[in-house]
Amino acid sequence: MTAKEAADSVLQRLEAAGYEAWAVGGCVRDTLLGRTVHDWDMTTSAMPQQVLALFPHCVPTGLQHGTVTVLESGYAFEVTTYRAETGYSDGRHPDAVSFVGTLAEDLARRDFTVNAMALDVRGRLVDLHGGREDLKYRLLRCVGEPERRFREDALRMLRAVRFSAQLGFAIEPETRRAMAACADGCTVLSAERIRDEVEKTLRSPEPYRALELLDYGMLRAVGLEPGTARPWPTVTINSPATAWAAFRLAVPDFDPTIMRLDKKTGRLAVETAALYGPELTMDRLKRVVADHGWDVGRCLCALYGQTDLAEELERSGDCVTLAQLAITGRDLPVTGPAVGRLLRQLLNHVLEVPADNERTRLLELAAIWKENTL
């Protein structure tokens, strides 16, 4: 059973029990765009306890907000009671959630018109805010008054840029003006929330749109000021590390620690960005791997769109790391810190003369060079 078939089964069971039930939000938008749907969210007139009673396998994930996760045929679906939200005193979360009686009231609380459409199991579309028209013209527009929407929840501004990058949509002028007016509200957002939205934008078909977040002033909360970006680099992004390396190239002030990146991704991004510039040749890649390790080497190749170069080097078996030397530290005629220095000297030599990575030859060189490492 496909996810769509399982979602239809949930909608049908709700309807059979006498409730209204609709697929809603991004799944409807993506269906109309012919895109792959990853998550089917639903809204219903049924109260949370009624949903819990109707489905044998479900999880009460957010009862205070009316959400129950229904497990059906190996898929998980968020089913939420029609609701309205009031008061956003923290600029992020509603102060109160109330259950309402109509789909229209539920759709009115949503962020953008393209996300405010509902589809029933028979394919009937409810579009009260012009979402389908905006899909046609590839526009991202707020539901209702844009400034009000952004004052309610500052994260919506970052989501606007992210959606525009993922979908290739323009942001409607009034919505764009409201973003500029409300950008200071993003200071209430956590670094983790900002990081997640920036990364999704960076990994979209239009990653350069991430610089709009900077231009609007939405990234002040993570120490980044408008007007500090360089032109977007022509690079290939295929992982979180390459995404953040590209961002670092365009925004030199970007600090992975403030953005709460994990240590490995942050290190890879910074090191890879620092190495980007000259043409990437096989000889240069060998030096990068020898000095910085395979993770940085692969990341740099990916950034250049030359992953085949890393694969070629791995297949060759050429010595580019200390572990590939034909001898180990135990074979050397030195002790203590001199071991590491001599191994590094031998590796540097082998990078220049690959044929010398042979035990007898390396021991000869070690005997000659040992005095220089003491």
Regions found by a protein language model. Name each.
Residues 1-374:
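Catalytic cores of the polymerase beta-like nucleotidyltransferase superfamily
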